[in-house]
């Protein structure tokens, strides 16, 4: 199975937990306990049955994966990405996007000058932050708000940025 545009990243396994095969997962769902609620998860090669044991801080969960029964097996899953078919997810409003949909979008200034490419979307607790890699090789971060990103066109895979005044160098 290949991971393509029809799959959405819901989480990443970042550590083993305990000796009975549990793992810690950084989730990208609104409610971390929903990581396994949308349907079968896959890493691209196999389907994984995930059961959430507990929610811990910063959008993370401790989970059990069927067939993983010891710490060594759990440690082997570190950095494994967990995806779900987008057809299993709820429909979004017009101004909502999944993180994976934004990564790779071309970013332009209002005058159509290329500003860069979206390389990552973070959420440190106070809102989404978009990381953009510029043609000069710099990485810039901006709050993901409608004032800064007034236009997003998923058909053309482009978004418009109006950088805040304090960034001055982009005028």
Curated annotation (Swiss-Prot):
One GO BP annotation of this record: ribosomal small subunit biogenesis
Localization in the cell: Cytoplasm
Keyword flag Hydrolase: no
Record bears the keyword Disulfide bond: no
PRC barrel domain segment(s): 94-168
Keywords, comma-separated and alphabetical: Chaperone, Cytoplasm, Ribosome biogenesis, rRNA processing
GO CC terms, sorted: cytoplasm; ribosome
Any matching Pfam family: RimM
A molecular-function term among this protein's GO annotations: ribosome binding
Assembly and interaction partners: Binds ribosomal protein uS19.
Similarity comment: family membership: Belongs to the RimM family.
HAMAP family reported for this sequence: Ribosome_mat_RimM
Free-text comment about domains: The PRC barrel domain binds ribosomal protein uS19.
Function: An accessory protein needed during the final step in the assembly of 30S ribosomal subunit, possibly for assembly of the head region. Essential for efficient processing of 16S rRNA. May be needed both before and after RbfA during the maturation of 16S rRNA. It has affinity for free ribosomal 30S subunits but not for 70S ribosomes.
Name this polypeptide is given: Ribosome maturation factor RimM
Organism of origin: Anaplasma phagocytophilum (strain HZ)
Taxonomic lineage: Bacteria, Pseudomonadati, Pseudomonadota, Alphaproteobacteria, Rickettsiales
Gene that encodes the chain: rimM
